[in-house]
Regions:
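N-terminal cationic and glycine-rich segments that engage phosphates or anionic surfaces
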Residues: 1-97, 101-434
Length: 434
């Protein structure tokens, strides 16, 4: 492992990418401590961490607790991406057309998502300013004029736009997916605070229960280890479909086709994107509900859409399964695969080229995705159930999801770095799972 890390730093291009990514993430972390003018963030630090503020704060790496310029985060971008990709499924012809235009279509979609993100960020910033000021008893905003709210919303929107720019810079010039890396950095930054809360609850004034609390912490460690091992295994597991290439015939001459190979289909083609989207999707109505604390509907949403509540947990798993299938077929296009194989004189033994191959790949992808979706759902709620049984702090409820995202993003980043090493004939350390 250490040799591989050394290999990373020996290659100038990879070293530059790593250092650039670290620099961008440091900028992000600094920004989480810069408070928005005309606000008193101290009042948020004493709020109940069991509410949606606590969950948003974990995902934002503490930005919301400080009500910093990055308090809105990149949730608007995630929401905008979900909406646009849903619209591309033959809902609006223009968006469907973009989906079929290749690189040009992706650029158009990306540009629209940027504009849509800014609009959503501004709306969310207004709502957060007003809502969290009400939660804090009117003490968050020091000047209650409408111009102050407008100014604060503008600053928060600019913060989201800057985060989006940081993510794009990391994607273009750094390592891995920039947006995922920002989420990763925020979650990692929140770990010490969550660990401290667990320590204070379990060991401060433990008295005669100290031994039982130690056993509980050991069990937590075993659950964490199981999640890490499970995520690594399922992220690397693939189903290899054998591919053969026909011999080309020209006159009396016969030419050997390409070497027989295989088509690898991952058990979880969607990665951890479904978990990120499901978390953001489930927190959105709770965030809105917090803006109207006196409403009976809002109280029901806040209580029942909690990750540890049976209704919230069921919706969470359902969203993960739905997004896993949705993104698996975005990442893997059976129709395009079958078409490319046919053009290259390739075929799956026993399966006719063309439509039959497409149907065969689709059937296998459905089965693999089912396994991946159930795994993601189970591994996401396992820590939630354990947290409920072990009576851990509410902030630890989101810890399982955080760990899943952290491990998934870290693994994808290591694969990206390893692919760079392989190009330069260095040996990586991620072993393949057959």
């Amino acid at each position: 492992m250490f040799r591989t890390i050394s290999n990373f730093m020996r290659v100038a291009e990879i070293r530059r990418k790593i250092l650039f990514t670290l620099a961008m993430l440091i900028v992000f972390r600094i920004g989480t401590f810069i408070p928005v003018p005309h606000t008193n963030a101290e009042v948020l630090k004493v709020q109940d961490q069991a509410n949606v503020l606590g969950m948003l704060n974990v995902f934002g790496g503490g930005a919301l607790q400080h009500f910093s310029i990055f308090a809105v985060g990149i949730t608007p971008y995630i929401t905008a991406s979900i909406i646009v990709q849903l619209l591309q499924m033959d809902v609006i012809p223009k968006f469907s057309e973009w989906a079929k235009q290749g690189e040009m279509g992706r650029k158009k979609s990306a540009q629209f998502i940027r504009y849509f993100t800014i609009i959503l960020a501004f709306i969310q910033a207004i709502g957060m300013s007003y809502g969290f000021n009400n939660i804090a008893g009117g003490q968050l905003i020091t000047d209650q004029s409408w111009t102050t709210y407008l100014f604060i919303a503008t600053v928060l929107t600019a913060g989201t736009a800057f985060l989006l720019w940081l993510g794009e810079q990391i994607t273009a010039n750094g390592v891995g997916n920039g947006i995922s890396m920002i989420i990763f950095a925020g979650l990692v930054a929140a770990i010490p605070n969550v660990a401290n809360q667990i320590y204070l609850q379990q060991f401060q004034n433990a008295g005669d229960q100290l031994f039982m609390h130690i056993i509980k912490i050991v069990l937590i460690g075993l659950v964490i280890l199981a999640i890490v091992v499970g995520v690594i295994y399922i992220q690397q597991a693939v189903r290899k479909i054998p591919i053969q290439y026909a011999k080309a015939v020209s006159g009396n001459n016969q030419y050997q086709g390409a070497k027989n190979t295989h088509l690898p289909l991952k058990v979880n083609s969607a990665g951890v994107i479904p978990v990120i989207f499901a978390s953001a999707f489930l927190m959105t109505p709770r965030t809105i509900a917090q803006l109207f604390p006196d409403s009976s509907i809002s109280k029901w949403l806040v209580a029942n859409l909690d990750f540890a509540h049976p209704i919230g947990m069921t919706l969470y798993v359902g969203l993960i399964v739905a997004f896993t299938y949705f993104y698996a077929f975005i990442q893997v296009n059976p129709e395009q695969m079958a078409e490319n194989l046919k053009k290259q004189n390739g075929y799956v033994p026993g399966i006719r080229p063309g439509k039959a191959t497409e149907q065969y790949v689709t059937k296998i992808l459905y089965r693999l995705t089912f396994i991946g979706a159930i795994f993601l759902g189970a591994i996401s709620i396992l820590p939630l159930v354990f947290t409920k049984i072990a009576t851990l702090p509410p902030s630890a409820q989101i810890g399982g999801t955080s760990l899943l995202i952290i491990v998934g993003v870290a693994l994808e980043t290591m694969k990206t770095l390893e692919s760079q090493l392989v190009k330069r004939h260095y040996k990586g350390f991620i072993k393949k799972v057959n």
